[in-house]
Amino acid sequence: MTTLKPGDIAPKFILPNCIDKSIKLSDFLGKKVLVYFYPKAMTPGCTVQACNIRDNLELFKSKKVEVLGISPDNTNKLLTFVEKKMLNFTLLSDKQNIVSKKFGVWGEKIFMGKKYFGIYRTSFLINSSGFIDKIFFKFKCKDHHKIILTYLNSKKSD
């Protein structure tokens, strides 16, 4: 699990989006960003999570929060995910797991007694100066957007 904590500077990264355009975290300096890591596009939990963000994106935007979803999927799979689910925010491909390792969300997991390596579903709210404001983990996919919006609503706007 991540060793990052609120107050730490968010690790810098450059990743391709679903149409192979390079996106840098530094492109968002001056804006708040929700960087959320998810295991695999088009799977049930990840689809629920992404569609709930899609359906509530205006609420995130009203809090001046941009959304970036990151997974180990290739750009073609991300494009399919975006098109099939009509996603209205940016998905990034971390095929080599370099960024997920920088954020400390890639590691050994156990499912039904089998060990494997994968993404720990984790979200980082990064402030407009590039520092981690809040880390969200151990949540149900269907509640992800509610937890983050509740947190955003509890803060004074900046």
Swiss-Prot record:
Gene3D superfamilies: Glutaredoxin. The keyword Oxidoreductase applies. Disulfide bonds join C46-C51. It comes from the Bacteria. Residues 4-157 form the Thioredoxin domain. It catalyses: a hydroperoxide + [thioredoxin]-dithiol = an alcohol + [thioredoxin]-disulfide + H2O. The active site is a conserved redox-active cysteine residue, the peroxidatic cysteine (C(P)), which makes the nucleophilic attack on the peroxide substrate. The peroxide oxidizes the C(P)-SH to cysteine sulfenic acid (C(P)-SOH), which then reacts with another cysteine residue, the resolving cysteine (C(R)), to form a disulfide bridge. The disulfide is subsequently reduced by an appropriate electron donor to complete the catalytic cycle. In this atypical 2-Cys peroxiredoxin, C(R) is present in the same subunit to form an intramolecular disulfide. GO terms for cellular component: cytoplasm. Belongs to the peroxiredoxin family. BCP/PrxQ subfamily. Its EC number is 1.11.1.24. SUPFAM superfamilies: Thioredoxin-like. Monomer. The gene is bcp. The keyword Signal does not apply. This is Putative peroxiredoxin bcp. The active site is at C46. Keywords: Antioxidant, Disulfide bond, Oxidoreductase, Peroxidase, Redox-active center. Thiol-specific peroxidase that catalyzes the reduction of hydrogen peroxide and organic hydroperoxides to water and alcohols, respectively. Plays a role in cell protection against oxidative stress by detoxifying peroxides and as sensor of hydrogen peroxide-mediated signaling events. One of its GO terms (biological process) is cellular response to oxidative stress. InterPro entries: AhpC/TSA (IPR000866), Peroxiredoxin_BCP/PrxQ (IPR050924), Thioredoxin-like_sf (IPR036249), Thioredoxin_domain (IPR013766).
